[in-house]
């Protein structure tokens, strides 16, 4: 791949990477000289102070510099490139109100992330009127509709690389006036199989375009994109002060394969974790197996995987952020599918994939990646659905209390991005991972999963990477003497989850979500109140439901768990319904106390004797 040429047809020089940190930066949005309409939107969204990546990147962007920024997930990278683009558009519209041209192109690897970026653009452009128009090309609409959307020359286009190339091919999209190019989650764009699209796009982009590359890690993929699109970029490696603290507490539990289900049952039924939880599993079948298992015990959850329609996936994330659901079971097989194939036994072959820590790879690891970037690429080609789906990266999950790695990921890089879903924005969170020891692998065939064979080797790499960045992965021990009391109930619930039940649940869920996603989309746009009743955590009922499993007998409850589930003093609870008339009983009681009686000495009047007929 060639490096991008500048205006004089000279390859852009490589720039030494200077480490930028977020040391005592007292910048605020007022000092950034943004348009008043943008400041008004920031005030409405309660943005009082820029994050470190925003404080560093926005002034450089307004000065016209190309930027390659590495900052952790949840650090405000989206606003760091959206605000400068909007500022430039507003300045151009002020000089020429009749200007119509697509000047900003934002590339993302997944549809979910495209929807998220579109919302950020809409939020910040809320007070700009018709001066700023944006289009999301990842929406599931026909080619004719997309052509109509692009015919009015929107200012900003948000898309995956494949959609951009498709619209360039049919002349629906013009990049002749492009001034800003953003590649968000840059390290994932090539990993998701967009290599050919990116190469074609590099030839279609005009010279002199300002480029933003945003990523949580700096890998060989990012270096490739830097050579294709950037001209002497300023490299920002930001480390938040918050990150140096204990933002995410990391724990690991070593257990047998069937004990994963037992511990999950105990955790949720005894409410050992308070708040919202994301459970990561290895593939789609595991999604439904775990959901059906939790249904046996009355624990509601919703699934998220690449088979579901994109509108349903986006709606699940939105409702989860609003607090409608507390548990999401997500199939995160894309990090594995998109990474370079390797054997987990080979420690050396993993180095390129596992340039991780919570902040990403260190400088030494990046240098090692560069040396190994010449190895042949053995990626498995992803399907269109798999390209569009990604759950452990980029998606803005809000207020997640815990990430539960039901199936341990195959790389430390994937682990880093998974636990990045919690502890965002300076908040605390917890990551709990189940690890199957080598001597326990394959002993329980119905619950066995292939990647568990290498859990211990992967865990060693995870611990090594996290320790380099000052983070400790601590062992966590359950009191198995108390947990074992629930084992027979777990066995009963697991026995009902057959392979056929999983297949039926999978097919039924897709049918239900297709109806919700396609036929009712426009109806719900006109009737937003009815959308609130559309839930994704209903029971699939493809497995045999055993009602007695939904309730925990008191004799099974540990003393601490009993206190947590129910209050000791609940007051009087009546189990017998009185057949007496309540009002008559109260009236008699009042009369006995002297209330409602006539004063003594007053002569009783017979109404029949005192009735006077009116005169005619």
Curated annotation (Swiss-Prot):
Binding site for ATP: 71-78
Domain notes: The Q motif is unique to and characteristic of the DEAD box family of RNA helicases and controls ATP binding and hydrolysis.
Family as reported in the entry's similarity comment: Belongs to the DEAD box helicase family. DDX56/DBP9 subfamily.
One GO cellular component, as annotated: cytosol
Sections of the chain in a coiled coil: none
Listed name of the protein: ATP-dependent RNA helicase dbp9
Motif (Q motif): 27-55
Top-level taxon of origin: Eukaryota
